[in-house]
Each structure stands twice: as C-alpha cells, then as structure tokens.
C-alpha cells in the first residue's frame, strides 16, 4: 500500500502560452496508443486528463476519457481488433467501453444529451466538466467550458454542478473530499452542504467502489486532509454503524502526514508505505471493510493496527510506546503487525518512534522480527519430539526467550538453546531424549 509520487510540472493555468497550446503540449496526443486520425469527428477528451493537464499533474500515461457521438463500446472493440490490446465493456446500456493497450487506459463513452455541452452538464464537479474538442489534424484542439470550470480551477474551488448530479451516482459525494484533498481545493459551501446532507446515500453504492475511492484518498499526498473531511462530514457513518470497537476509535489525524512521518525518522519510501494503512485504520474497522468486500489480508492488517493503537491509548502508553507493555503483549504486537508496525509508530512521539523504527529496520532484531532460535525440525531431531501443540508451545517459548535477550541472537549457538529447551520440557513434566 503505497502513495504515488507528486507531479512536478508547472500548471498551464499560470503559464504564458495560450491554454490550448499548453494543453496540447502537456497531453502529447502524438504518444497516445490511438492516433488522432482514428478518432471520429466530434470526439472530445473530458474529465481528469484535461483537469490534470491544466494543473500540471499528468503522469506518463494518464487515463484518457473520450466522449464520442457514436457507439463508444463498438469503437473500443474496433480499436482492439486493429491496434491490439483488450476491449472491456463498462456499461452496455450507456455504450461505455475501455481499451487497455501498452500501459494506457482509454474509456470511450457515447455522448449523453444532444450536444457536448449537455453531456458536460451531467457531470459531477465543474473542474471535471472541461472538455478538449480534439482535432483531426496536428493542431491544438478547442477547450469547451460551459460551467466555468477553468475559473474554479484558478480559484482552487471544488463546486458541484447540481445537487441532482451528485445523487445520480452517490459515489460522487465521496469523490468530492478526495478531489479537494488531492488538488488542494476548497469545497464550495453549497456543495459541502449537499455532500453532508446526502451522505447516507453512500450506503447504496457498491462496497467495492466505495473502497476503491477510499484507497485513492488514503494514498494521496494530502490524504490526512481527506480523512479529516470525511470524518468532519460523517460521510462514512452508514458504513461504520456495525459492532462498536473497544477503546478510542476516532484518533486525531494531523500526525498522518509526510511531514510528521519525517519528524519521526521515516524515509519518504517508508512513509509512503505506512501512511495509507494508518489513515485507513483511522477511518474504518474490520466490520466496515468486510461490508466493502475488502480482502481478508487488508481486513486483518487494519484490525491489528487499530487493535494495538487502541490498546496503547486505553493504557495511557502512547507517550511511552509499546516497550511498556508486558512481554507477552509486546511479542504478540510484533508478530501481528510485522510490516505494518510503522503505521503504529506514526501514533507515537517522535523520539519514541525514531528508536523503534531503527530497531524495526534491523531484520535481525529478535523482538521486532521474532523467530525461534531453532526450527521445529531441529527440535524434533535433537529432542525426540513429535509435531503437535507441545512442539508449538516450545517454539513460542524459545522465541520469547530470544526476543528478550535470555537466549543469544546468534542462531548457531544451538547448545544453549537445547539446554533451555530441555529445562522447559522438564518443568512441563515432559521427558526428552537425544
């Protein structure tokens, strides 16, 4: 679970060349997998690629959303036959198809309404309702902006086109805070009122779609702001109304930023891996993730991060860290969290987190990466044990002894390990033999 890098291009909105020319250069249509001459007359590029092109946020292969006056589904199938790639049906009724080719994704939709302007009026937010009418020759196209999305882009405002548009697909209610965080926009007051008023409608959206939108939010560079917007508006209340979790469930989110991770000694790579999980755990419990059809692995990881955060908060140990927990709990914590331990370290004071992070980076640290000094096969061979619960308990005991320094870290010192193992078996009343 990682965060994407930030784009570095300067916004075209602030540049000197005309917008059309700047957008043409940024989008570089000559590199698209479908040449311009294959596009039917009246084709327009809409949505995120236009918006991000104007903001200087385009990736190497941006997702392209095209609107055509004809059958979008048939067009993607035709291109797949002629150019290769894979055609996917997204919406047969509305004639929306997808072409996946050479690392590119092109979504092609039949124009809704009697004109391109009518189609744009059906969209969610004004900054997503800017179209670039594509030419058939090598000349810049024309921008179509009937809803003044360019003005909102310049002003940094996220404005819903209409209340009814948000309700046409309630996922748009969640997309608003995600876009506001991602683009650094302020949500217009009327738009925010609509989003909050209709938040219960998010429960009508397929859980998989909600989770996909949330994952985009928590992975964003400004994901902490997105999390705070969701919580301030209660947008996930319909999804989090399951069994109550024990302990504090709504921690602050100001620390879930790249800057705060750096204060705790994280590299950017480590922070970009840990922050999304920490943010997701701040939003959702295992019940909600299950309702959204999250994978078992993701649900388990989120459960462990939440459990140990709540445990530390309940015991008042956030300032001290988990080193103040009883030994058995410390061992459970490290066994359960593993690669997600940094997500918990974000909750701790910088000095405590730095020390723990240093130990976590040491893959030979016997507590932060616990393992028995001898494996089960070796113990069976030397002690005449059989597979079963007794062997499992012995392995767990030896793991704990090594984790807390009562056995050497060097796994080659088997004689001491065997002596301790025999002592444990004797205490349990279990004879052993060589």
Which residues make up each language-model segment?
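Catalytic cores of the polymerase beta-like nucleotidyltransferase superfamily
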Residues: 1-434
């Amino acid at each position: 679970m990682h965060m994407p890098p930030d784009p570095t291009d300067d916004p075209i909105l602030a540049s000197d060349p005309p917008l059309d020319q700047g957008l043409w250069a940024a989008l570089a249509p000559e590199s698209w997998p479908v040449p311009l001459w294959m596009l039917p007359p009246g084709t327009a590029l809409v949505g995120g690629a236009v918006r991000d092109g104007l903001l200087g946020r385009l990736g190497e292969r941006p997702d392209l959303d095209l609107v055509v006056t004809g059958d979008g589904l048939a067009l993607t199938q035709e291109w797949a036959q002629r150019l290769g790639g894979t055609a996917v049906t997204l919406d047969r009724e509305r004639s929306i198809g997808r072409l996946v080719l050479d690392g590119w994704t092109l979504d092609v939709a039949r124009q809704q309404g009697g004109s391109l302007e009518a189609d744009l009026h059906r969209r969610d937010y004004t900054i997503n309702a800017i179209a670039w009418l594509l030419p058939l020759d090598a000349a810049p196209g024309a921008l179509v902006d009937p809803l003044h999305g360019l003005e909102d882009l310049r002003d940094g405002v996220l404005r819903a086109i209409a209340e009814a548009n948000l309700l046409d697909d309630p996922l748009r209610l969640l997309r608003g805070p995600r876009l506001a965080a991602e683009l650094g926009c302020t949500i217009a007051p009327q738009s925010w009122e609509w989003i909050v008023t209709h938040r219960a409608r998010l429960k009508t959206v397929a859980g998989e779609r909600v989770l996909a939108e949330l994952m985009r939010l928590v992975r964003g560079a400004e994901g902490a702001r997105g999390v705070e917007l969701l919580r301030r508006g209660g947008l996930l209340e319909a999804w989090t109304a399951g069994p109550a979790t024990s302990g504090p469930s709504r921690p602050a989110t100001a620390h879930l930023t790249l800057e705060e991770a750096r204060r705790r000694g994280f590299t950017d790579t480590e922070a970009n891996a840990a922050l999304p999980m920490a943010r997701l755990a701040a939003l959702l419990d295992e019940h909600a993730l299950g309702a959204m059809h999250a994978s078992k692995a993701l649900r388990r990881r989120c459960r462990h991060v939440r459990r140990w955060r709540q445990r530390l908060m309940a015991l008042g140990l956030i300032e001290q860290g988990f080193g103040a927990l009883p030994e058995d709990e410390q061992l459970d914590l490290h066994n359960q969290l593993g690669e997600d331990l940094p997500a918990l370290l974000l909750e701790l004071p910088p000095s405590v987190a730095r020390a723990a992070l240093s130990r976590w980076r040491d893959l030979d640290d016997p507590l932060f990466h616990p393992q028995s000094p001898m494996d089960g096969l070796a113990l069976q061979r030397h002690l005449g044990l059989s597979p079963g619960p007794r062997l499992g308990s012995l392995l767990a005991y030896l793991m704990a002894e090594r984790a807390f320094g009562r056995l050497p870290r060097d796994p080659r010192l088997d004689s001491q390990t065997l002596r301790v193992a025999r002592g444990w078996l004797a205490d349990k009343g279990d004879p052993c033999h060589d």
